[in-house]
A protein has these predicted regions:
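Single-pass alpha-helical membrane anchors
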Residues: 1-20
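Auxiliary, metal-adjacent structural segments of Zn-dependent hydrolase domains
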Residues: 26-78
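Soluble non-cytosolic domains of exported or imported proteins
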Residues: 40, 88-89, 93, 201-205
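Non-catalytic terminal regions of proteins
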Residues: 58-60, 103, 108, 233
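Acidic helix-start/capping segments at beta-turn-to-alpha-helix junctions
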Residues: 59-68, 111-127
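Active-site scaffold of zinc-dependent metalloenzymes
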Residues: 62-95, 99, 104
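Catalytic Zn2+-binding segment of zinc metalloproteases
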Residues: 98-116
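Metalloprotease/metallohydrolase-associated module, dominated by Zn2+-dependent proteases
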Residues: 115-241
């Protein structure tokens, strides 16, 4: 009997592993389709030091097709900005991406702020009950990929998904919300979230929300000021010297 149960358990484990692999493979395939024709060749690069925080960083100016023209970070020190990016937007864009560099360098600090200030948690793996249809169509974001799954108040999960299994670009996406308590999937943030955060230009992940608040001055004023206070106190050189 025990031997029989052991065999059944082994089969279940194999089925779960295959299922998990299939989900990730499908998401990988869809993201590859969305990025078809993308080239991220480096055309020019400059290395700088941020006068406010003191961090060293590198800007790589790349092909306009890289991530379909979306600026992004690739590691703790490097941001990629397409050469076609509007020059008048470059200063704010660099500030935005510098926040992502700091998020990569000091993940524990940012996660603590998200939990304390916003009741958010982020994690590397999806929750057990997240629908397969969302996981298979999930859009990968280089700036959030270390821990892409986000939950607000232990219940609501936001995720960027492609609108089809054959997307023409990274722009063919929408933000959907999954309610872990009820299982409902909606295209709008829960009313409680909207009451708390107000209008957010990028609501898929706290990393993007934080970068928008600090660099772009977006979002709820009170929340933005609270975040700016802890951010400046912790990262500004003038407050550390």
């Amino acid at each position: 009997m025990l031997r029989y149960l052991a065999v059944i358990a082994s089969i279940l484990v194999i089925v779960l592993l295959v299922s998990s692999f299939s989900k990730h493979e499908t998401a990988d395939e869809i993201n590859a389709i969305a990025r078809k024709g993308n080239r991220c060749d480096s055309h020019k690069q400059v290395s700088l030091q941020d006068p406010k925080t003191g961090i060293d960083y590198t800007i790589i100016f790349c092909d306009k097709t890289c991530e379909h023209g979306y600026p992004h970070t690739i590691n703790e020190k490097t941001m990629m900005i397409p050469e076609s990016h509007p020059k008048e937007r470059l200063p704010i864009t660099v500030e935005h991406e510098k926040i992502h560099l700091l998020q990569r360098r000091y993940p524990e600090i940012w996660e603590a702020w998200y939990k304390l200030l916003w009741s958010y948690k982020i994690q590397k793996t999806p929750p057990a009950g997240m629908p397969k249809e969302l996981l298979e169509k999930r859009r990968f974001n280089p700036d959030t990929e270390d821990k892409p799954f986000t939950c607000w108040r232990g219940r609501w999960w936001s995720i960027a998904v492609y609108t089809s299994k054959n997307p023409e670009s990274l722009a063919d996406t929408k933000i959907v919300w999954w309610d872990e308590k009820t299982g409902q999937i909606t295209g709008e943030a829960p009313p409680e979230w909207s009451d708390f955060f107000g209008t957010q230009p990028q609501d898929e992940h706290p990393h993007e929300m934080a970068a928008q608040m600090i660099a772009n001055g977006a979002g709820n004023k009170n929340l933005r000021e609270k975040l700016m206070t802890v951010y400046e106190k912790h990262f500004y050189r003038s407050n550390r010297e």
